[in-house]
Amino acid sequence: MELFGESDAENKRRILRYFELLEICNEINDNRPAKKGQRNVSIIQNIDGNNIVVINDIRFKGKRSINWKDVKEYLKEYVGDFYKIASTGDVIYIGSDLPSEYSGSEYTHSMRGTNAKAKANAAQGIPEIIEIAIGKHYRKNNEIKHWRNAMYGWYRYDSRFALPVYANNEIEKYNIFHASLIIRYSEDKKMYLYDIIDIKKETSNPIEP
């Protein structure tokens, strides 16, 4: 209480937000024991109070290019699953269209190098990337081809994940990436993950192993 008394309104807001995000982080990690055994994924929080999904394995390597067919096949394992965004309570479903869109969209095929590798391997952390997402921005659907599967519009959320960087076959650090989740609000009044775009490596300090 003394800390709040000495802080200005903005600092108080940041402190409260920090503890709110920390609680979300702990809750997600505590509720996912089975998933951890199948995928080497965890959630941490950086010094700015941002939750980050740490993906510890590089499953899709590709020295020159990513084999997106392998990514597509991997994503099919999620179809039919659903996950809740902790900050909003929104339930996000994984539809049968995600594997093709995620691996074959124009955005995906425009990616090269580090960002392409990041998107491919982010597939391993999709459940957690959804669960820690924040922000919620709506836009109306104006595309005829999506008049049914996005009848009630589109939402965009922000999320973060981290991937290891190796040196001499050992993890040297983890690079952090920001990403935007594109969610379609379908005619069945359910929200579906459509794609993950705008993947960019953050210039802030990387995570040490």
Q: What kind of region is each of these model predictions?
A:
Residues 1-209:
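Ribonuclease/tRNase effector modules and their secretory precursors
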